[in-house]
Regions:
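Conserved alpha-helix/loop element of class I SAM-dependent methyltransferases that forms part
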Residues: 34-64
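A short acidic, Gly/Pro-enriched loop at the edge of an enzyme's catalytic core
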Residues: 121, 125-134
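Conserved class I S-adenosyl-L-methionine
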Residues: 163-204
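N-terminal, positively charged/glycine-rich alpha-helical extensions of SAM-dependent methyltransferases
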Residues: 1-36
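A short SAM/SAH-binding and catalytic strip from SAM-dependent methyltransferases
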Residues: 132-148
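Class I SAM-dependent methyltransferase SAM/SAH-binding core
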Residues: 65-123
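Short alpha-helix
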Residues: 217-233
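A short glycine-rich, Lys/Arg-flanked "PGG" loop and its adjoining helix->strand segment in the class I
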Residues: 148-163
Length: 233
């Protein structure tokens, strides 16, 4: 069972994480923004994994309205737009990442893609949908202090008869720590860990650059606790 935090505690976590992601934005941009700007100037450019795109094709996203929660620099949402999605909205807490998304949207030439800076738990009323598809991509759930509230946000955003699309890694991976050098990963954490992980060595998952960052918090949610919500039934 995932631990539940008060609204004040939850906001402290999400504010801290936002500050850490704001710091990470220029680090990420140094690795890929120029390349992505050039790539998105090409019609039909797509960054989505094949298995992710296969599932979205099964849903039938072409012409549908899509909200992407925690969209980062918008590359996945813009990929869907390039492949025929309808009006799209990307939402993320980090203003610098949203600025990168807006640059990519301009390069892609799409006028009906909007990016909004917002705490995911407090989405403004004028962006509350409903949408045909509400989606998150890999890594999002672990940043959510309170899953029940997060899935309630998803429920409110999704139109009746719409689709919720979640691409996520299995939480068992969070039980492991990477080994040193060529040493294998090793089991360290409980699958049922309740307290958050606290790290302050950056968020560069492109080049693996370590830097002193604001502390950021991630959370272990079991597979069962992630699948029990009504909007997923």
């Amino acid at each position: 069972m995932s631990k539940t935090y008060s609204r004040k505690q939850r906001r402290e976590f999400t504010d801290a994480n936002r500050e850490a992601w704001d710091e990470a934005a220029p680090v990420h941009a140094k690795s890929n923004q120029s390349r992505l700007l050039e790539a998105f100037s090409t019609p039909g450019y797509n960054t989505l994994d094949d298995h992710c795109l296969d599932r979205l094709n099964e849903i039938g996203f072409q012409g549908k309205s899509i909200a992407h929660l925690c969209c980062n620099n918008g590359r996945e949402l813009l990929s869907l737009k390039n492949l025929g999605a309808g009006p799209c909205v990307g939402l993320d807490a980090s203003a610098p990442f949203i600025a990168h998304a807006e640059e990519l949207a301009k390069a892609s030439g799409h006028s009906d893609v909007t990016f909004v800076t917002t705490d995911i738990y407090d989405i403004p009323a004028d962006r509350s949908g409903p949408y045909d598809i509400v989606m998150t991509t890999i890594g999002v759930l672990g940043w959510m202090p309170n899953l029940a509230e997060f899935f309630d946000v998803i429920r409110q955003l999704t139109r009746r008869g719409g689709h919720v699309f979640i691409e996520e890694s299995h939480p068992v991976l969070m039980m492991y720590e990477p080994g040193e050098g060529t040493d294998p990963s090793y089991l360290k954490h409980s699958y049922f860990k309740e307290d958050p992980w606290v790290e302050a060595d950056g968020l560069d998952y492109y080049q693996g650059e370590k830097y002193d960052s604001n502390p950021h918090y991630s959370f272990q949610h079991t597979l069962g606790s992630s699948l029990k919500y009504e909007c997923l039934r």
